[in-house]
Amino acid sequence: MSQEKNTYTHINHVRLTMNTRDLSDDVIFSIKKNKSLSIYGGIPENILLDLAEIIKDIDGFKLIVILEDNSSNDSINSLDILSFLPNIHHLDILVHQATPLSHIDALDHINDLRTFTISGNLNKNIDFSPLRKFDKISSLYVNDLIFPDKYYDIINNNPIENLSLRKVVLANLDKKNSMKNLEVLNELIDEQTLASKFPNINHLSLTNCRKLSDFLFLSCLNLERLDINTVKGLISIPKLKSETLHTLQILNCQNLEDISYIYDLKNLKNLAITSSKVDFQNISDVFFKLSLQNFYFLSNKNKENEMFENLAIKHKVNNSAM
């Protein structure tokens, strides 16, 4: 029995390294069952060859590649491992190495990429053009640098459903009916066109968007979930369409004062408000005007937190972070 037997017997996700010497039956079973694995740092060539045979017929396989500086002459390192695994559909790249990653040319080896995530130590001029060969990408996540406008054709030419970027310039994007989830981590430009660009969006997340000050565009969206985190320009919650919205999170928006329109959201089930200027009486009123399942609240004042906990218990509403 393989020496790695005990390591992998009870885990749900397999992680292979340059120290991996063989693939036990338990490891192979887990790989096939979960349709995913992680490769950390590098992996011996013979293991890669075995792995390629194991996953070649698995539809929807996900590979997580962690790039780091420890390497071995006996292992295949960096993104070169992709040349052995052309049939993966989902790829996450985490760059932990000291040298910034400057290219992703190895994606040329992949036949049919469906989702792509990259994060960590990336060169600000990294070339994303290898993504242009694909036309079935449904999820794109690039969070640790700005995804340049010159690569927006990649978004326009794929059926993107889930998009997460630091900066989004809507004027450079085509109308996309497929878009369901949008996460913006720093800057949203031309926000007033969001409803026309992505008419079917149902989840919007805005984080640290310091230039946003007019939030009326939110009133045009048929959202199921809205997350706003650390947005200083948010002073009042705009009128939102209430038919579909079930989850609303307003976190660390320190200038927020007015939540009166929240009372109209009769289908809302999950609400979170933290670190705001909202008067506690207005927070208390939420319990009487909405039928929530979960209401998470955090104030800078301990007394308000204590009063809120008592209200949550009284009204039998969960008080936990979402």
Regions found by a protein language model. Name each.
Residues 12-24, 33-50, 61-77, 81, ...:
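Concave beta-strand-loop units of leucine-rich repeat
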Residues 52-58:
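Short, contiguous, helix-prone interaction/anchoring segments in small proteins
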Residues 82, 107, 131, 217-218, ...:
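Core hydrophobic positions of leucine-rich repeats
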Residues 104, 126-131:
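Long, acidic/polar, low-complexity amphipathic helices and coiled-coil-like
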